[in-house]
Amino acid sequence: MTLARYKRTTAGLVASCLLPWLVSCAPPRLDEPVIGAKNFTEQVVLGELLAQEIEARAHLKVERRFYLAGSYIAQQSMLAGRIDMYVEYTGTALTAILKKPPLHLADAAQNEAASLAEVTKLYQQRFQIAAMQPLGFENTFAMIVRPDETASGPGLGMAGVDTLSEAVGKAQNWRLGVGYEFEERPDGLRGLEKAYGLHFKGEPRTMDLGLLYRALASHQVDIIAGNSTDGPIAAEHLKVLADDRHYFPPYQAVPLVREAALKRWPQLRGVFAELAGKVTANDMRAMNEAVDGEHKDVAVVVRGFRAAHGL
């Protein structure tokens, strides 16, 4: 076991032991909807979008509990009644929470529909949590490179590579950078390597997601596992290699809401219906970049999006 993996394993064990204490020791909640979000920019933006829409349309005061440390903490907070809702991604819900294998239907639309149906059914049966209609975009994993061989350095053979299949036989010269979660997840690195027969140069460099793009720009790595709605992709004109074998499952952004909360505040359903299909992948990239790249306040960015879309 490498030192990095030992640290991650130890951290995971500590987090597992502390989780009940962390959830139970959260501050007591008030009689108002509590909105959660995981600890990265897109999640905070989406949490703020839910909050502003509920305040404006349902005329309810809401509590924001953002920066939860990952899907597992968010899910446990839902089950404990510490939060009432947050936005999750269908592929993450299916594989990381429900522990189901990804669906790999040949037709992309059927795959999206089947994954959403499975998540909707099992969340209701197991957790009494309702999956609302998708917001309109998915945030899948994305294998990202600098846009041309010149920028990538000599001898890497990236010119003309547009898909992951075309990377086979060349990637052994590429240094890979990944986030901690991607290396360990069932729908992450090891499965990707197996699905395509990919081999990279040496061990992957693991780091916080926010550092991946810096490492790519400074030539510390040659390819990274990012997210398809990351702001730097468009802002820095980076190239996403197409997942032409459809390895990654759909990751539609879907609000998850405790059924108890929907019974307590039935007007919430109208809010989620109004948001359905309103956020495109380009919208999400632009908001992420506005916060991360332009250092704008999340609430201001969300208000601008709502105004531009008549929300």
What is each residue range found by the language model?
Residues N111-R175, G277-A281:
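A conserved helix-loop-strand patch within extracytoplasmic ligand-binding domains
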Residues L50-A58, E149-T150, G157, S165-K201, ...:
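Ligand-binding cleft/hinge of the Venus flytrap
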Residues W21-S24:
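C-terminal motif of bacterial Sec signal peptides marking the signal peptidase cleavage site
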Residues A171-D243:
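Ligand-binding pocket segment of bilobal, Venus flytrap-like solute-binding proteins
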Residues L30-E42, L60-F66, Q172-G177:
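Short, well-ordered beta-strand elements
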Residues I97-A109, S115-M132, S218-I223, P232-H246:
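Ligand-binding "clamshell"
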Residues Q125-I129, L135-A142, T206, T229-A276:
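Periplasmic-binding protein-like
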Residues E63-Q76, G202-R214:
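Short helix-initiation/N-cap motifs at beta->coil->alpha
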